[in-house]
């Protein structure tokens, strides 16, 4: 199976898992649950679930076990987008080519749906059937996702990002923002896949952390590039939004060509990290292909 087929299969699997975990929730057919479904299920690259599946499969973990962490990390991602789009944050009206949640369902339902998706993520990890995961590793997975989602990770990065609007931000500070805002959850996705494999996955965490940090920054650099050279129809969100908000970006700091070079260098670093795992007879091809996809994508 080539990478596009692999990726498409992952999208389908992640969507099925998300639907399965959302379907039994109470208050079906109410605006809040409809907002949750809209925010979590309509579109999206499913990059983070792919990282969970690819990392777990590399260690021989079954898809059945990986469905829970894949859905959990995507619930956190979906909640973060719903809240990021709110008027008090980035004030976006378009996401994945559709009206944002607060535009379609109102701000109150968007806030509640985001809150509910966040807590659903931890319910999934604590309660779901993961036959290959020990209690110790399940607790580690919950702790990992909590750390990546909170003030030490994604929320902290968003706070730094909001504070930096309209200011000149040096490269080191910009990377700090994105290691937290974007990188923390990408790192968590890789770690959840590894932790699902127990001790053999734990032993690989230092190498996988280097890989995840490199692709996390590369993902953001490419996002910044696409905000300059992309178009709204392809991106599914407003092109040029970062510039309108006065945000520092990699193209603004480095220039477009140097930003592209930085993204390529980061992906080279990621691939180099994986060589240590390939030398242990682990199949890293899916993670390598995902790294290349990150800087080849157009949305």
Walk through the language-model features, giving the residues of each:
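Mg2+-dependent prenyl diphosphate-binding active-site environment of isoprenoid biosynthetic enzymes
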Residues: 12, 22, 26-273, 283-295
């Amino acid at each position: 199976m080539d990478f596009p087929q692999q990726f498409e299969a992952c999208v389908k699997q992640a969507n099925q898992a998300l639907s399965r975990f959302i379907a039994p929730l109470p208050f079906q057919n109410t605006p809040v649950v409809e907002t949750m479904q809209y925010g979590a299920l309509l579109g999206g690259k499913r990059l983070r679930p792919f990282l969970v599946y690819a990392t777990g499969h590399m260690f021989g973990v079954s898809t059945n076990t990986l469905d829970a962490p894949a859905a959990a990390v995507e619930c956190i991602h979906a909640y973060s987008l719903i809240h990021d789009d709110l008027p008090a944050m980035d004030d976006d009206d378009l996401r994945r080519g559709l009206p944002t949640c607060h535009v379609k369902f109102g701000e109150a339902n968007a806030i509640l749906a985001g809150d509910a998706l966040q807590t659903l993520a931890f319910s999934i990890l604590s309660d779901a059937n993961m036959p290959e995961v020990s209690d110790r590793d399940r607790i580690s997975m919950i702790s990992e996702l909590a750390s990546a989602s909170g003030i030490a990770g994604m929320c902290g990065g968003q706070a730094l990002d909001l504070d930096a609007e309209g200011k000149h931000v040096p490269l080191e500070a910009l990377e700090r923002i994105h290691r937290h805002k974007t990188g923390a959850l990408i790192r968590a996705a890789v770690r959840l896949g590894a932790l699902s494999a127990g001790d053999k996955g734990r032993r690989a965490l230092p190498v996988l952390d280097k890989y995840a940090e490199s692709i996390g920054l590369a993902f953001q650099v490419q996002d910044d590039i696409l905000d300059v050279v992309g178009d709204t129809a392809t991106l599914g969100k407003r092109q040029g939004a970062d510039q309108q908000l006065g945000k520092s970006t990699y193209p603004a700091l480095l220039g477009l060509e140097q930003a592209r070079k930085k993204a390529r260098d980061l992906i080279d670093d990621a691939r180099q990290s994986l060589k240590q795992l390939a030398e242990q007879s682990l199949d890293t091809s899916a993670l390598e292909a995902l790294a290349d996809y990150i800087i080849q994508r157009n949305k």
